[in-house]
C-alpha cells in the first residue's frame, strides 16, 4: 500500500521490546499506522476467540490489554471492523462445526484479507480486494497444510484432515497454492507501483514459498 499510494514517510529510530537497548530505524506513514491498526483488530478478536473456545487465560489477558485501543478502532473504522468481526465469527463457527469445504473456509479468510487490503475507496480498490482475497486464501491453505499432521495428532480441526491420507495429497495442495499465488500476482501486476517493485515481486514470486 505504501508503494502504491506513496504517502509522506517519516524516518527515525526507536527502542522496542525486542531491542530495548539499541534504537532501531523505523519508518512511519499513514499506511503503516493503518496496518498496525488492522493488526490490533485481528489480534484482539483472535484472542477473544481463543478465550471463548479454549479458555486460554493468556488470550483473555492480552485481549483486556487491547480492549481500550480496539474501542477506538471500532469508532475509527466502524464498517471495516464490523465486517472483519463478522467474518472471523463465521470462520470460527465453521471450524467448530467441522466444515469440510476447503474452498469455503479459505474463502472466508480471503474475505478478511480483502477488507484489510481495501484501505481506500478509490480506483484501485477492486484490484486490491482481489489481491487480498487470493493472498488470504493462500495464507489459510498454506497454514492448514503446514499444521495438518500436528492437528490430526492432537485431534484439532483442519480442513485437510480427510484429504491428508489420499495419494497425491501434497501435489494437489501444491497446485492449489500455485493457483492462489498466480491470481494474487496477476492482480499485483495491474497496480502502477514504481517503488519497491523488485522487493515486492521477490516476496510474491519467491519469498512466500520459503
Identify the residue ranges that each predicted region occupies.
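Active-site alpha-helical segments that house and flank conserved acidic catalytic motifs
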Residues: 1-27, 34-64, 127-150
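Divalent-cation-assisted or electrostatically stabilized phosphate/pyrophosphate-binding catalytic cores
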Residues: 17-38, 67-108, 126-129, 151-191, ...
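Long amphipathic alpha-helical coiled-coil segments
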Residues: 59-63, 67, 191-205
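A mid-sequence, solvent-exposed acidic-amphipathic segment
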Residues: 98-142
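Histidine/acidic-rich helix-loop-helix segments that form or flank divalent-metal centers
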Residues: 125-128, 202-210
Amino acid at each position: 500500500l505504501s508503494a502504491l499510494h506513496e504517502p509522506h514517510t517519516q524516518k527515525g529510530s526507536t527502542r522496542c521490546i525486542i531491542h530495548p537497548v539499541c534504537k532501531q530505524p523505523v519508518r512511519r506513514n499513514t499506511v503503516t499506522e493503518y496496518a498496525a491498526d488492522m493488526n490490533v483488530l485481528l489480534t484482539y478478536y483472535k484472542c477473544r476467540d481463543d478465550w471463548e473456545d479454549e479458555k486460554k487465560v493468556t488470550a483473555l489477558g492480552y485481549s483486556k490489554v487491547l480492549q481500550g485501543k480496539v474501542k477506538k478502532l471500532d469508532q475509527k473504522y466502524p464498517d471495516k471492523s464490523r465486517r472483519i468481526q463478522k467474518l472471523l465469527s463465521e470462520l470460527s463457527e465453521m471450524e467448530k462445526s467441522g466444515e469440510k469445504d476447503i474452498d469455503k473456509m479459505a474463502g472466508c479468510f480471503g474475505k478478511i484479507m480483502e477488507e484489510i487490503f481495501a484501505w481506500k475507496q478509490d480506483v484501485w480498490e477492486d484490484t486490491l480486494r482481489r489481491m487480498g482475497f487470493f493472498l488470504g486464501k493462500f495464507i489459510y491453505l498454506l497454514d492448514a497444510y503446514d499444521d495438518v499432521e500436528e492437528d490430526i495428532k492432537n485431534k484439532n480441526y483442519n480442513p485437510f484432515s480427510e484429504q491428508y491420507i489420499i495419494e497425491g495429497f501434497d501435489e494437489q495442495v501444491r497446485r492449489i497454492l500455485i493457483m492462489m499465488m498466480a491470481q494474487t500476482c496477476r492482480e499485483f501486476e495491474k497496480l502502477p507501483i514504481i517503488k519497491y517493485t523488485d522487493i515486492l515481486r521477490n516476496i510474491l514470486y519467491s519469498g512466500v514459498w520459503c
